[in-house]
From Swiss-Prot:
E.C. designation(s): 3.2.2.9
Descriptive protein name: 5'-methylthioadenosine/S-adenosylhomocysteine nucleosidase
Organism: Mycobacterium tuberculosis (strain ATCC 25618 / H37Rv)
Further comment found in the protein's record: Was identified as a high-confidence drug target.
Function, as annotated: Catalyzes the irreversible cleavage of the glycosidic bond in both 5'-methylthioadenosine (MTA) and S-adenosylhomocysteine (SAH/AdoHcy) to adenine and the corresponding thioribose, 5'-methylthioribose and S-ribosylhomocysteine, respectively. Also cleaves 5'-deoxyadenosine, a toxic by-product of radical S-adenosylmethionine (SAM) enzymes, into 5-deoxyribose and adenine.
Primary gene name: mtnN
Length: 255
């Protein structure tokens, strides 16, 4: 039986490319969220326009799993880079996500902790949600040798070919526009990129016991220029993230 993949995006720029290549599309609205069912490269998918943030994404992921019967859920879109070795246009595929804004406030600082737990109520040693290693192995094999085009000159591309990385992606309900915080999150939590939705996808999919994946293209570097960079690069890098998703659909429908 063919597996239906749920695909979540937060903003219109992230959905535009995928909606443009979706065939046999049928649209419905549930809880003010637009869902487009159809096929991408002959694979059954449901595209969802979640809106930004963890609550919107959690609601959307729940509907995809429960109402639409999706057996794998993917978030594809853009993110801010945390790792100084990365550049705008690079792709980060999560092998783990951490909600950096959930935890225990003490001495005016937040100690990140696993969602659903605090140190003195249901304590746990876990922090974050790992992607199924078998899924990551299939993803890496499928993307071996896969290349992405450099950003255009119009978008400020300098001819460098974007690279694909695997690592920790951080999630929080803030748009990061601060170099000090960026450096701290990278140093303390090992985050390669930061965004506002992936942690919710992971938490919901863990509850439903279904596979998930987060694919992010860097639209900015989460520092003082992040707003300028975002508007300059978002369209092109979001399309790059979508192309990676299309490449991965054969292995995601096998999950």
């Amino acid at each position: 039986m063919a597996v239906t993949v749920g695909v979540i995006c937060a903003i219109p720029q992230e959905l535009a490319y995928l909606r443009g290549v979706l065939v046999d599309a049928k649209r419905q609205q549930v809880a003010q969220i637009l869902f487009d069912s159809g096929q991408l490269d002959a694979h059954r998918v449901v595209l969802a326009a979640a809106g930004m943030g963890k609550v919107n994404t959690g609601l959307t992921a729940t509907l995809l799993a429960d109402r639409f019967g999706c057996r794998t859920i993917v978030f594809t879109g853009v993110a801010g880079g945390l790792d100084p070795e990365l550049c705008i246009g690079d792709i980060v595929i999560a092998d783990r996500v951490v909600q950096h804004d959930f935890g225990l406030l003490t001495d005016e600082r937040l100690r990140p902790y696993q969602p659903g737990h605090i140190p003195f109520i249901e304590p746990t040693e876990r922090l974050g949600y790992p992607v199924d290693p078998a899924v990551i192995d299939r993803v890496k094999h499928r993307l071996d040798g896969f290349t992405l085009a450099p950003l255009s000159t119009a978008a400020g591309g300098g001819g460098r070919q974007p690279r694909i990385y695997y690592g920790t992606i951080l999630t929080g309900d803030q748009y990061l526009h601060c170099e000090r915080t960026r450096n701290r999150l990278h140093h303390e939590l090992g985050g390669m990129a930061v965004e506002m939705e992936g942690g919710a996808v992971a938490q919901i999919c863990a509850s439903f016991d279904i596979p998930w994946l987060v694919i992010r293209a860097l639209s900015d570097l989460a520092g003082a220029d992040s707003g300028v960079d975002f508007n300059r690069f978002v369209g092109e890098v979001a399309a790059s993230s979508a192309r990676v998703l299309l490449r991965l659909l054969p292995v995601l429908t096998a999950c």
